[in-house]
UniProtKB/Swiss-Prot annotation:
It comes from Rhodococcus opacus (strain B4). Catalyzes the reversible oxidation of malate to oxaloacetate. NAD(+) binds at G14, A15, A16, G17, S18, I19, G20, N108, Q115, V132, G133, N134. Its EC number is 1.1.1.37. GO terms for biological process: malate metabolic process; tricarboxylic acid cycle. The keyword Oxidoreductase applies. Keywords: NAD, Oxidoreductase, Tricarboxylic acid cycle. It comes from the Bacteria. The gene is mdh. This is Malate dehydrogenase. It catalyses: (S)-malate + NAD(+) = oxaloacetate + NADH + H(+). It holds the Pfam family Ldh_1_N. It is an enzyme of class 1 (oxidoreductase). NCBIfam families: MalateDH-SF1 (TIGR01759), PRK05442.1 (NF003916).
């Protein structure tokens, strides 16, 4: 008789929202942690959204997923993160009309301070944290700084959506299949300052540098399309990306736990150790591989002046956000 794998406790904040709704059923089906890992789901919401989260929990029950052992709904972070192995921090304060950037950072600083402290106190020793709620990089920075007993590299922010968007645009432009594109990189912030880099990519039997030689397409089409794709989707749908964001979050954790494909890498925002001139501690996106369940930044990539300028601009954006939340006392 074979021994059953140890169940994974997965906590999803903002579970009643559209990204959470799009992610939860795929997580329960095994898309995130693989077909052999049983799941215990913890749905964490603010009190006004608990009823909606309970409705989602009912639907999860009704789906009778073989891997799903149980579902709990909480509004107390200490209960929601108790023993969690994987935390998807999707819930955040969205920017409302007329809201100043400082107000947005302050509102989210409070949320992610509380969540970081709760994770520090009650999560599993090997917890992995993915921040999806925007401003994701700085929210991850705040959470990590409020969880001093958790290794900083366990706190990451989502740039896999930007990474996937870049691959899709490159496929459309080149005629290559998505599966034949590798080694794309997103640098910097998950914002309009991000830099999607294809200079080291492989596109079928072509190099990304060869395709990037068309600078008019690169600077006038590719980079702005990827960087502003979220706004274009809001304009078209009337609401923000949900299914694609959920898919990217699942991709991110899947590769973190189970490994990146041989010969390829992905993009993850994580605390810098000083690589590529990014200030230490800043949560910035890098090219990474997952090795034995841990992210490792791909080293030794040549960065030309074209790329350096764009990386530096996005890093400056991150430094501005970091300085703002530091001034508010969140880090």
């Amino acid at each position: 008789m074979t021994q059953s794998p140890t169940p994974a406790v997965v906590t999803v904040t903002g579970a009643a929202g559209s990204i959470g709704y799009a992610a939860l059923f795929r997580i329960a089906a095994g898309a995130m942690l693989g077909p052999d890992t049983p799941i215990r789901l913890r749905l964490l919401e603010i009190p006004p959204a608990v009823s909606a989260a309970e409705g989602t929990a009912m639907e999860l029950d009704d789906s009778a997923f073989p891997l799903l052992l149980d579902v709990e709904v909480h509004d107390d972070p200490k209960r929601g993160f108790d023993g969690t192995d994987v935390a998807l921090l999707i819930g955040s304060r969205p920017r409302s009309k007329g809201m100043e950037r400082g107000d947005l950072l302050a509102a989210n600083g409070q949320i992610f301070t509380v969540q970081g402290r709760a994770i520090n106190q009650v999560a599993a020793d090997g917890v992995r944290v993915l921040v999806v709620g925007n401003p994701a990089n700085t929210n991850a920075l705040v959470a990590a700084n409020n969880a001093p007993d958790v290794p900083a590299e366990r706190f990451t922010a989502l740039t896999r959506l930007d990474h996937n968007r870049a691959i899709a645009q490159l496929a459309r432009h080149s005629g290559a299949a998505v599966r034949d594109i590798s080694r794309v990189t997103i640098w910097g912030n998950h914002s309009s300052t991000q830099y999607p880099d294809i200079f080291h990519a492989r596109v079928g039997d072509r190099s990304g540098a060869d395709i990037a030689a068309d600078r008019e397409w690169l600077t006038g089409d590719f980079i702005p399309t990827v960087a502003n794709r979220g706004s274009a989707i809001i304009e078209a749908r009337g609401t923000s990306s949900a299914a694609s964001a959920a898919n990217a979050a699942i991709d991110h954790v899947h590769d973190w736990v189970l490994g990146t494909p041989e010969g390829d890498w992905t993009s993850v925002a994580l605390p810098s150790t000083g690589a590529y001139g990014v200030p230490e501690g800043l949560v910035s996106s890098f090219p990474v591989r997952s090795v034995d369940g841990a992210w490792q930044v791909v080293e030794g990539l040549e960065i030309d002046d074209f790329s350096r300028k764009r990386i530096d601009a996005s890093v400056a954006d991150l430094e501005s956000e970091r300085d703002a939340v530091r001034g508010m006392g969140f880090i």
